[in-house]
């Protein structure tokens, strides 16, 4: 992104102002209450991660206050790890300590679990995704890039999940040619839940009333391109839809910004519906919470992962919905327990899914981080030695272990 511009950001509202300058912040979190600091803390990924990647590469500079009062002013490209895998860090008493970066292998999939480590990395990359455990970020400089001249939101409908996955794989292979920025999946049970929401709430549901009766599942797309390439990109997309058994005539599409936002809300209405469903159950079972997975698998393993999810959930007799960032091979399985026994079973399945996904080379925490509830998964992914190396990084930046108690590490 040679034309990228730097921008000091204190809030996502400030980032929103970039749109008037034909610029945008590519991580583009889908949660409207997100903050820039929050997105940096967990290396957030929005729907547009498919094309642009997560938060980390768009963080150009950080000012960080460490737990012992030291202040670091870090800049990408200036403060980097030496080829030896080491860097110098000033200590509180004015000395310098040699710090070695971890040697574990970072997943090639989306991943927000643990401290990033890679050869030639920038020191600020430790803080992006560290969940507040290494320092308090007080200032952030992010990169914005030119916004596409033309944008279109499209919802495609499919009569089988197999069609939808095959369509997605074709888009993944031709992402540059087709100018697709986001690919979001709404599975069969999820689409049924949205239909029920429309029936109950009508026009206030955020779900259009013209859902095709034959639709088994849906895929939401964002297309962004130059003005000159726009018509050609949409024509090619229509061809790909037809090639996979879909019908462009049943698709929804929107070009104007307000209409695009309406289609985006169609996808975002789903987690709102799930949360409302769980809230209703909690009236009689207050110990229940939603169990939402956050796992990504390598390319070519998505069908296998979906099969594992569905088979285990069916065998356990649990209710669930599947949706999410299918373009990144990153689907959210939301398990919907009806009582405490099902909740315990759901947690057991959650751990089984994590083991299976890591065995494929994927991540059990693709975008939401580890937090305080999933510390077991950090060890599942990086094993005892990897966690030990992370604790050494933690000790270098936070020697008194004052920050983020219980986060990442049990």
Please give the residue ranges for each predicted region.
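Alpha-helix capping/hinge segments and adjacent helical runs
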Residues: 360-370, 399-403
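FAD-binding subdomain of flavoenzyme oxidoreductases
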Residues: 1-171, 177
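Short low-complexity, flexible loop/linker segments enriched in glycine and/or proline
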Residues: 39-42, 198-199, 336-337, 379-382
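C-terminal substrate-recognition/cap domain of FAD-linked oxidoreductases
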Residues: 128-130, 136-347, 352, 356, ...
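Activity-critical C-terminal alpha-helical subdomain
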Residues: 375-410
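Short coil/turn segments at secondary-structure boundaries
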Residues: 30, 254, 369, 405-408
